[in-house]
Swiss-Prot record:
Protein name in the entry: Orotidine 5'-phosphate decarboxylase
Function: Catalyzes the decarboxylation of orotidine 5'-monophosphate (OMP) to uridine 5'-monophosphate (UMP).
CDD domains assigned to the protein according to its UniProt record, in alphabetical order: OMP_decarboxylase_like
Family listed: Belongs to the OMP decarboxylase family. Type 1 subfamily.
Lineage: Bacteria, Bacillati, Bacillota, Bacilli, Lactobacillales
Keyword flag GTP-binding: no
Superkingdom, taxonomy of origin: Bacteria
Matching PANTHER family: OROTIDINE 5'-PHOSPHATE DECARBOXYLASE (PTHR32119:SF2)
Length: 235
């Protein structure tokens, strides 16, 4: 089975989206991540339209609220034809459980229920921030493991984590869980605003289920060639 490489579309309007997408290849061969910028500017209709065109979609809104609100939000998102969506693991087990129930309730008959991924610690969070700003006494690996265990028990299908943490998670949480990893930079690329990064080959070696890559693809001279090269390296 081919491991997905998901293109992070850090764009804020449909015009930029329409300029980029044809450069990535045929819709059925492209897995995209839509975040807050595009969703908040263009609304749910753009997600539904892209799904109908054949794109696989990771809708990354990182929901975090009281369980009832998250249930209703997830129920609405499940109607858009997405493959993955996210909540913050720090929202707790009841919220994660509510999100999963909302996705199940909202998915149209005959369609696949979107996979629920819980965000552990953002890849922009360093050990210093974890300890000094979040007042967490655990190591990064311990904190991520604790959040992943909570998410799995609450019904999440997987987690968003750094590739550096996947090996430890697989050993302790199991292989029957998705490990989707941003913070991917091909060799020679700048880290930008990411703190905990790896190459596609390292992510493969350490056991990532899927990787999320943005600027190394979207800002490349030939985005489709860059995308295909990263797919090859990861698979």
């Amino acid at each position: 089975m081919t491991r997905p490489v998901i293109v992070a579309l850090d764009l804020d309007n449909e015009k930029k989206l329409n300029e980029l997408l044809p450069k990535l290849g045929k819709p059925e061969n492209v897995f995209i991540k839509i975040g807050m910028e595009l969703f908040f500017n263009e609304g749910p209709a753009i997600v539904r339209n892209l799904s109908r065109q054949g794109y696989q979609i990771f809708l990354d809104l990182k929901m975090s609220d009281i369980p009832n609100t998250v249930y209703n939000g997830a129920k609405a998102l499940a109607q858009l034809g997405i493959t993955y969506t996210t909540v913050h693991a720090l929202g707790g087990s009841q919220m994660i459980k509510a999100a999963k129930e909302g996705l199940i309730a909202g998915t149209p008959v005959g369609k696949n229920i979107p996979k629920l991924l819980a965000v552990t610690e953002l890849t922009s969070i360093s050990d210093d921030i974890l300890h000094e700003e979040q007042n967490c006494n655990l190591s990064m690996n311990q904190q991520v493991l604790s959040l992943a265990e909570t998410a799995k028990k609450a019904g999440a299908d997987g987690v968003i984590c750094s590739p550096l943490e996947v090996k430890n998670l697989r050993q302790n949480v199991g292989d029957d869980f998705l490990y989707v990893t941003p913070g991917i930079r091909p060799a020679g690329n700048a880290k930008d605003d990411q703190s905990r990064v790896a190459t596609p080959a390292q992510a493969k070696e350490w056991g990532s289920t899927a990787i999320v890559v943005g600027r190394p693809i979207t800002l490349a001279t030939n985005p489709e060639a860059a995308y295909e090269a990263i797919k090859k390296e990861f698979n």
